[in-house]
Design a protein with these regions (language model features):
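Carbohydrate-associated surface elements
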Residues: 106
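Conserved small/polar residues in nucleotide/adenosyl-binding loops
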Residues: 118-120
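N-terminal glycine/serine-rich phosphate-binding loop of ATP-dependent small-molecule kinases
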Residues: 1-99
Length: 120
């Protein structure tokens, strides 16, 4: 019987990581790629979704296939995870309208949060 493979990719704040495993849970290949946050103003932290998120997914999936020599048709599932509830406005074709605002570290709405807390 032909072996089945499973790919997992995680996009994080500073890097994206990927792993390819077989049906026994053995690691066949791993790959990590770094990406940078932009800091356009004090307390503002952003990612370029096309480059950092989609680009990393493409780089990692291709690297895992190349390193492992596994045929893409033998990969039965791909699981992804990513950083938390970031803000990425998109157009009607789901194309980013701006860089993503990173949840948890971007502080540009601090004043608005305090106003909201005062009314809860």
């Amino acid at each position: 019987m032909k072996e089945s493979y499973f790919m997992g990719i995680d996009t994080g704040t500073n890097s994206s990581k990927g792993v390819l495993i077989n049906s026994h849970g053995e690691i066949i290949a791993e790959h990590t790629t770094e990406h940078a946050m932009t800091n356009p103003a004090p307390g503002h932290y952003e990612h370029d979704a096309d480059k950092d998120w989609w680009g990393d997914l493409c780089i990692i999936s291709n690297a895992l296939i190349e390193k492992s020599k596994v045929s893409p048709s033998d990969i039965k599932a791909i699981g992804t995870s990513a950083l938390g509830a970031d803000c990425l406005p998109v157009d009607d074709q789901c194309r980013p309208l701006r860089k993503a605002i990173l949840y948890g570290i971007d502080a540009r709405a601090t004043d608005e949060i305090e106003i909201g807390r005062a009314h809860v």
